[in-house]
Regions:
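N-terminal beta1-alpha1 ligand-phosphate binding loop
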Residues: 1-13
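N-terminal beta-loop-helix "entrance" segment that forms/cooperates
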Residues: 17-45, 136-139
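Short, well-structured alpha-helical segments in soluble
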Residues: 38-56, 144-159
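Glycine/small-residue-rich loop that forms an oxyanion/phosphate-binding "nest" at active or ligand-binding sites
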Residues: 40-97, 101
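Periplasmic-binding protein-like
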Residues: 57-64, 158-166
Length: 204
């Protein structure tokens, strides 16, 4: 999945932007809920401290929608560190007054809801929905299930914006937006744009 996320991010890379995709060798294969998130932290922090620094990179994108370890990682470097959940919620509130999120498993809902509150978007968030599609199975083959849940978010929640709550859903946003006739945000593209914008602002 790391390679697929890197490919999705590359589609939003501006001229001169290069992407290095890394994944901790230890820890769970995917992050689905708080237990997986906690289990991955030692490997994530070790990888971050060993390979990422202010001189080597201009920005860091955390490609887990749970924004695992994000607040701690922001403290460790002076460059922008952006989580895809964080970026998606900010983008959603710029495009509409309300949003609903479609994620993978129900186990992730409490983490995402806590993050939404921490970012200050509790009033704009209507609901976090679970498609019950495991992270490693997300893709074009499960598109119908995710589309169904996204349509319910529009029809039942009456949200202005739909947020796709998994990095693996990045390739679905454009087509879903056209079908649902409203903005659909994936965190990978949102985080890429925010990272590049913040880097340019720092260089100005």
């Amino acid at each position: 999945m790391t390679a697929e996320i890197a490919e999705a991010a590359s589609a939003f890379a501006h001229t001169g932007t290069s992407i290095t995709a890394v994944n901790p060798p230890d820890g769970p294969a995917s992050i689905q809920g708080p237990e997986d998130g906690n289990a991955c932290l030692p490997g994530l922090f070790k990888l971050f401290d060993e390979t990422l620094n202010d001189q080597a990179y201009d920005a860091v994108l955390i490609a887990c929608f749970d924004d695992t370890g994000l607040f701690e990682l922001k403290k460790r470097v002076s460059i922008p560190v952006i989580g895809i959940g964080e970026a998606a919620f900010h983008a959603a509130t710029m495009l509409g007054r309300t949003f609903s999120t479609v994620t993978t498993l129900s186990a992730s809902i409490p983490v995402i809801e806590d993050n939404i509150k921490a970012y200050g978007f509790a009033d704009q968030s209507i609901r976090v929905r679970a498609s019950e599609v495991p992270v490693l199975e997300v893709g074009q083959q499960t598109r119908k299930i995710i589309h169904y849940e996204a349509r319910l978010a529009c029809e039942e929640d009456k949200c202005d914006v739909v947020v796709l709550g998994c990095a693996g859903m990045a390739g679905l946003a454009q087509s879903l937006s056209a079908e649902l006739e409203r903005p659909v945000i994936d965190g990978v593209s949102a985080a890429m744009e925010f990272c590049q914008t913040l880097v340019r602002m720092r260089a100005a």
